[in-house]
């Protein structure tokens, strides 16, 4: 299709999850509730880590940054999705759509790197406890956190750069609830044979590298745990890892489905459902996953609650 024969697109229309008026009301209330829980849960984690002395450790520092990333991730998508339930077929200027994609990819990629850093932290704590203060010094922790955000920005610029190189001169209705790369690619009147592959290679490379770090870390952790003679020691070591493993499984399972698997292997409806899970649901679940099974967090929350009401 030749761009010169069509009017250039100035805004995109998000079709959202549904056009049924009754479902729109139900979804609005439901997802507004999820968003509020997401904000309250993650802000609580950040405040607890900053205010409680017993949580001033690398593990909880990473957890506080994960909470911040989850807030950014959810906020990049949910408010616009909620508007879509009130005003059907939400219109977004092209630059706003590009900015949303950039934000989603930045926070999503940063989460990958933070989860890998948290796995390495658990590896050092369990396999080399005597060297923990050296290997996980404040400088190294800040370096890992900084690298996570930089990695997120670099990957986001890969996606955004590819999007900026495309021309849109025909249909402008995105069959999605946010400006994801794959639905936008379908609307382009440019040759997408190469542009469509680059983001998948970039995202796939990050997933492979971070999964490798997580896998190797947990292989060594498992070997170390199996060598422990104390049943109590094994239980304690396992309990410090189960929350992280749960978060990793949920998150990587969904993003691998979207960004690595061939687009022909799933439908647009499946894409929306899985995208909804990793952009909206998982940011709400993470604070619950890490707090419900963590004695330190529960104790810090109890003390903070007592301080408020005393």
From Swiss-Prot:
Residues on Extracellular side: 1-25, 76-99, 155-196, 259-271
Which residue ranges does the entry give as Cytoplasmic-facing topology? Answer: 47-54, 121-133, 218-237, 293-310
Provide the topology term for how it sits in the membrane: Multi-pass membrane protein
**Which InterPro entries does the record cross-reference, listed alphabetically?**
GPCR_Rhodpsn, GPCR_Rhodpsn_7TM, Olfact_rcpt
Transmembrane segment boundaries: 26-46, 55-75, 100-120, 134-154, 197-217, 238-258, 272-292
Matching entries from CDD domains are given as: 7tmA_OR5P-like
What terms describe the molecular function in GO for this protein? G protein-coupled receptor activity; olfactory receptor activity
Give the sugar-modified residues: 5
Localized where? Cell membrane
* Cellular component terms per the entry's GO annotation: membrane; plasma membrane
**Any matching Pfam family:** 7tm_4
Key word Transmembrane present: yes
User: Which cysteines share a disulfide bond?
Assistant: 97-189
Q: Which family does it belong to?
A: Belongs to the G-protein coupled receptor 1 family.
Q: What is this protein called?
A: Olfactory receptor 5P1
Which organism does this record belong to? Mus musculus
């Amino acid at each position: 299709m030749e761009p010169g024969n069509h009017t250039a697109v100035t805004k995109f229309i998000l079709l959202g999850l549904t056009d049924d008026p009754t479902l729109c009301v139900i979804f609005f209330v439901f997802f507004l509730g999820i968003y509020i829980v997401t904000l309250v849960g993650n802000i609580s984690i950040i405040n607890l880590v900053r205010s409680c002395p017993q949580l001033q450790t690398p593990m909880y520092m990473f957890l506080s940054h994960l909470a911040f990333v989850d807030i950014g991730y959810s906020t990049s998508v949910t408010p616009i999705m909620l508007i879509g339930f009130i005003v059907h077929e939400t219109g977004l200027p092209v630059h706003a759509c590009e900015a949303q994609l950039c934000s989603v990819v930045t926070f999503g990629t940063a989460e990958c790197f933070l989860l890998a850093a948290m796995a390495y932290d658990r590896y050092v704590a369990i396999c080399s406890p005597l060297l923990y203060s050296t290997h996980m010094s404040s400088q190294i922790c800040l370096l890992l956190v900084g690298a996570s955000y930089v990695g997120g920005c670099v990957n986001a610029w890969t996606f955004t750069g590819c999007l900026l190189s495309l021309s849109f001169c025909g249909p402008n209705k995105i069959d999605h609830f946010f400006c994801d790369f794959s639905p936008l690619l379908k609307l382009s009147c440019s040759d997408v044979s190469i542009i469509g592959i680059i983001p998948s290679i970039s995202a796939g490379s990050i997933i492979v590298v971070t999964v490798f770090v997580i896998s190797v870390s947990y292989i060594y952790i498992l070997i170390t745990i199996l060598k422990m003679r104390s049943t109590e020691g094994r239980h304690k070591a396992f309990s410090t890892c189960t929350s992280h493993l749960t978060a990793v499984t949920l998150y990587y399972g969904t993003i691998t489905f979207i960004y690595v698997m061939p687009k022909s292997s799933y439908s647009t409806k499946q894409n929306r459902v899985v995208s909804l899970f990793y952009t909206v649901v998982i940011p709400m679940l993470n604070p619950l996953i890490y707090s419900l099974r963590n004695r330190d967090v529960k104790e810090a929350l109890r003390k903070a609650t007592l301080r408020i009401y005393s």
